[in-house]
């Protein structure tokens, strides 16, 4: 039933695995077999408590993270230069944003990350903030002192959320900036399709501490995700995980 020109261009393999949900291939919303195992392998690769496949890209993952951590009427500290998905997550959760300014590079005319001192000052001024979200690395590839920020945030016993869209590779090489999970961020998401080998829109969410309820993350993802996720796309995410876990250091050394 596939268009002939499209079939000639793509070949038959993508369509052989483009199936709907049934027992043999598992289901993303209540994974019990191969998807469950794939997510566990991702968690093992990154050294975290729990990993989730995010089929709506990092935009959907960011919305899920915010909705999992803060409730309606609660305050969340975010940079001014956030992606629109952060604004969407705040709207959907009913949370109240408290904004902090990133560092501005006057020479390049771009925004960098936030300084640890900025985070500390804002938390001192707003004692009722329930979570902090930062971008690291930034959309321009600039990393901040995420370890110091994590320490400051955790001194208030609140979760640190990290938009690590451009950093799914950081964990796999010691010469790269510190990754969110290695800094102790409580939850982060990554665009596996941007930097690693997954197909477009495939991302990962990592839960890294008890400050975030992994069961709630699963529930929120079930609210946001399609009930017909693409198996070719999910397979590409699993294979990207395998590649970076097995060959990541070698590939990154060559690149660096």
Which residue ranges define each predicted feature?
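Conserved PLP-enzyme active-site core in the AAT-like
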Residues: 8-9, 30, 48, 58-256
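Conserved N-terminal alpha-helix of the aminotransferase class I/II PLP-enzyme fold
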Residues: 12-60
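N-terminal glycine-rich, Lys/His-bearing helix-loop that initiates the first secondary-structure elements
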Residues: 1-12
